Amino acid sequence: MPVMIAELPIARTHVPRDAVLFSATILGGSALLFWLEPMFARLVLPTLGGAPAVWNSALLFYQAALFAGYLWAHMLHRWPLRAQVGAQLMLIALAALTLPVAIASVPASWKALDPVVWLPGLFAASIGLIFIAVAAQASLLQSWYARGGRAPWFLYAASNAGSLGALLFYPLLIEPAVSLSRQAKVWSWAVLPLALFTAVCGLSAVRRRAAVGGGERESAAAPAQPIGAALRLRWAALAAGPSGLLIAITSWLTVDVISAPLFWVVPLAIYLLTFILAFSRSKAFSPDLIAPLLIVAISLITFVRAGAASTMFAIGGLLLLFYVALGIHRRLAADAPEPTRATEYYVWIAGGGMAGGLFAALVAPLLFDWTYEQPILLVACAVLLDPPPLSRSIDAFWHGARALPWRYGLPALGTLLYVTAPRVIDDANLGPAQLGGIVLLAAAALLAVGRNFSFAVHLMLLMAATGGISAVESSLAGNQRARSFFGVYRIYNDPKQGVRLFTNGTTLHGAQSMLRRFALRPTTYYNPMSGIGRMMTAVPTLFGTAARIGVVGLGAGTTACWKRPGQDWTFFEIDPAVVAIARDPSHFTYIAGCAPDMRIIIGDARLRAG
């Protein structure tokens, strides 16, 4: 999600008296904005059972609201200064009428839609106006400060310090110690001093313009250089790639790799840090060598389940996000226009960020039955990164006439070895020929770094060889996967164990024997010797033969086979996709064979059980 950004040629001159005022106001506003983001997402989280996708939907809304705030600031930029100040204060006043922060009441018909569609609407109805008002103030204040020719770029540091500070302090200090209701009240009251400081900044800017003789008219200046459509689209594309990658990596990590409270704050903090480094012109952490290596490495594991290597997968994903986003944001910083065009620059960056988020958080879940957005964005970012060759001498030879047979023969041989070898990537038992083919494809991809089209093609071949073909085959089969707001579900057979498995990422939701005589016998966590198995065996003794039993979570429906005559059972399942899978006898027969009339209530059991 783009933050307030700009070039940072900080002049070592006398600091004007109002610089501290503007810095403090921007810092406070940015801190409030990035306090509101995790706080409201945390407030909404229980309404959808704590699904990790809630944060992706939240990010999508925040990107859209940030775009609206930047667009508002850009529109006001053309107005007289007094009118700008008045309009911004009026917007804050109108937005304050929606406080305190709380979940808005929405039509019941909304919740009949996919959560990925209605959840951003819930965010907009609840905090949309106040978020836009606060998001606009940093851009406006930079514009006000720059009136009369002053360089506003040092205010960028204050904006990012507030954003990153709030984002890091929230999970460490605020969330563990302060209740959500109290947080919402404190945040709502904090808008008042922000409005007062904004008014004082506006008054200071107006007085300064009058003091230097400008009044409400701008001093004569050379016309700004025109900006073409190609450059605007370039800004948007360079912002869209990392923004979409942020959501894709966050989803991958929180669903498939590691599950931890508020873990999604970490990728967002890394994303913000790349903006700070890129626009500060810092030369630290050069991505030229590391980013292509990480792209190739992650391409090798994109279609592979994390399993026991989840920690290494998480570290790799975060490093990938950092170096790739840093490299692309540095290209974006190099394209920064003159200060008079700053608000337009911000609008296109915010618009690109929103487009990337829209694809990763909304379009992809509705369009794909698997997280194909991750490899798509990985290839797109590899092109946007435009890295130099890993070695110019090797690149010159490799793309010369003498290397032509090798240049095409290496990936062709790798592909041939992979195709002719048995594909057992799901079991992580690679045969020598298959492993050799993958090594050749990875080597060819590294040799192609610096040639964007060739690099992208080699990455796609590499991902196809490391599970991409199997993933597409599963999608084309039509009945092996299902995707919903709550995750990507996979139904597949394990011939070695003789069972059919039901998984979501690294989580096993159920298994059923493929042997007819054992098909209705509870397995996995629910077998007779498990804790649940022993408890269910004791139910008639403890609660009688007419016991009323509620089960939270349906999975494959395994526990339905513990139901005994006379008992009254109710299942609570939050995801309709899980209900459809469990009821489909072509997938699992627990419900059809043991309790075909089982009552299933769709929704969060914490809200529906009463």
Predicted stretch roles:
Residues 2-610:
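Alpha-helical transmembrane segments of multi-pass membrane proteins
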